[in-house]
C-alpha cells in the first residue's frame, strides 16, 4: 500500500481512480498494526489499488471523511464511498466486496 501524505492526494485518487481501498490508521494503534498486513494481503492477491493514511497526520481527512475511530477501511468506486468498516474489520466481507468490484471493472 502506498502512503498518501495530504487530503488533496486523497481527493485526487477519488477523482482519478475508478476504484481503490483507503486504510486509515494511527501511530499508537496496536490493532491497526495487526490489521494492516491482513488488508495488504487481500489487496495484493486481488491486484486491487490501495493506499493508507495516518489520521493524526491529516486532520482535514478526519473531518471530511468522518474518521472517528481506527482502523478504518473504505472502498471507493467511481468517485463514491461504497463500503466502510471501522474498529473491527471483517476480512471475509472485505475480500468479498473487493471481488465484487474487481468483477465489475
Language model features with spans:
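Non-catalytic, surface beta->alpha helical segment in thiol-disulfide oxidoreductase systems
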Residues: 77-105
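Local sequence-structure signature of Cys/Sec-based thiol-disulfide redox active-site neighborhoods
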Residues: 9-41
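Structural micro-motif
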Residues: 65-74
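Thiol-based oxidoreductase modules, predominantly thioredoxin-like and allied folds used
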Residues: 4, 24, 43, 47-61
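Short amphipathic alpha-helix with an adjacent loop that forms part of the alpha/beta core around
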Residues: 12-13, 63-65
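Acidic phosphotransfer microenvironment of two-component signaling modules
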Residues: 8-11, 59-60, 92
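N-terminal leader/targeting and pre-domain segments
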Residues: 1-19, 97, 103-105
